[in-house]
């Protein structure tokens, strides 16, 4: 997901830091398919996150006593619906002016901010801790959702899990936290695909177990077109169906600017990624949120082609990677996805 260049919801989390008895240590408007939640719940024990559940020699997470809201009226894929935008750890202008950036996002009709916390080769769970908290507070004031995302390397699953849970548990002084968490699944740090898959699933199962059955989780997957057609040796045996069971939404990296040029080809590439996920998860009807871009390289007409396909394919949401590169022409096209 990273560029190739130098009172918020806490669903199903019975969180009380320091409380005893914690658990052990590249389709807009469609409805969630009937029975999906009940079948998942049967497979996932409800988890309880607490400070003792993650070994930590890093900065402790605050407990503000924020209220856990009722779960009955909240959909698992809700944070992923509609128009979103992405911030990674290299978007320095956002980190320097977080509140102003959120204000601008809201003015452009953004519903959800996808915010990177860290990655596997950093030595802390939050690269920009103050900026993360400022964005969470500003987003809460403007009614925007915020989804945390993290890039694991799978070489150290314990660290990847620890950092994921730190994101889920994070609270600002005002009591605000992330609305969901999404795992960025693309790193080839572990060279053997079979080992990489085993560790991905071990990490994903641990995240689901700790977060609980109702907490919304997203799987950010490398371009399905690449995984299945143009570079099948990159990750043979990619576990599409198991991921669709563990996560509530799939977010394919549909970076057509790496592969094609022009609005028609951008539309074609976007359609391919959606169709491949639906084929690989046949019968599961997994919700899809398409991540387009790269914004720094895309044109206005290409963005229109992307949007046209997103609307035609009935995904639950779409976004562009990343926010600072989105031009006025791109915004004009993207606004129709609100």
Write out the residue ranges for each language-model feature.
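Aromatic-lined substrate-binding rim segments of carbohydrate-active enzymes
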Residues: 115-151, 191-219
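Short, acidic/polar
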Residues: 90-107, 158-174, 231-243, 299-309
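Active-site groove signature of glycoside hydrolases
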Residues: 114-121, 167-197, 319
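Aromatic-lined carbohydrate-recognition surfaces of secreted/lumenal glycan-active proteins
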Residues: 85-90, 145-157, 200-237, 284-297
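Substrate-binding cleft of secreted/luminal carbohydrate-active enzymes
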Residues: 247, 252-263, 280-338
């Amino acid at each position: 997901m990273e560029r190739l260049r130098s009172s918020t919801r806490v669903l199903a989390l019975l969180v009380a830091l320091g409380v005893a008895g914690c658990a052990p240590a590249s389709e807009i408007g469609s409805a969630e398919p009937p029975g999906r939640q009940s079948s998942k719940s049967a497979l996932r024990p409800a988890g309880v996150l607490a400070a003792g559940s993650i070994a930590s020699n890093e900065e402790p997470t605050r407990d503000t006593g924020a209220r856990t809201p009722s779960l009955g009226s909240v959909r698992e894929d809700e944070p992923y619906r509609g128009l979103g935008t992405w911030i990674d750890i290299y978007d320095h202008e956002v980190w320097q002016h977080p509140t102003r950036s959120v204000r601008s996002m809201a003015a452009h009709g953004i519903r959800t901010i996808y915010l990177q916390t860290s990655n596997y080769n950093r030595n802390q769970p939050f690269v920009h801790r103050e900026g993360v908290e400022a964005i969470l507070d500003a987003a809460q004031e403007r009614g925007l959702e915020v989804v945390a995302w993290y890039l694991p390397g799978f070489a150290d699953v314990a660290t990847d899990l620890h950092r994921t849970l730190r994101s889920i548990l994070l609270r600002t002084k005002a009591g605000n936290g992330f609305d969901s968490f999404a795992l960025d699944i693309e790193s080839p740090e572990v060279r053997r695909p079979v080992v990489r898959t085993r560790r991905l699933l071990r990490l994903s199962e641990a995240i689901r177990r700790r977060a609980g059955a109702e907490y919304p989780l997203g799987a950010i997957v490398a371009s399905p077109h690449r995984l299945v057609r143009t570079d099948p040796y990159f990750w043979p045996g990619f576990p599409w169906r198991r991921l669709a069971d563990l996560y509530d939404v799939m977010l394919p990296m549909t970076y057509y600017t790496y592969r094609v040029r022009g609005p028609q080809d951008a539309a074609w590439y976007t359609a391919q990624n959606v169709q491949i996920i639906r084929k690989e998860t046949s019968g599961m009807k997994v919700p899809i949120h398409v991540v387009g871009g790269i914004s720094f390289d895309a044109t206005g007409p290409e963005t229109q082609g992307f949007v046209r396909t997103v609307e035609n394919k009935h995904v639950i949401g779409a976004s562009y990677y990343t926010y600072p590169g989105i031009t006025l022409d791109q915004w004009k096209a993207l606004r129709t996805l609100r």
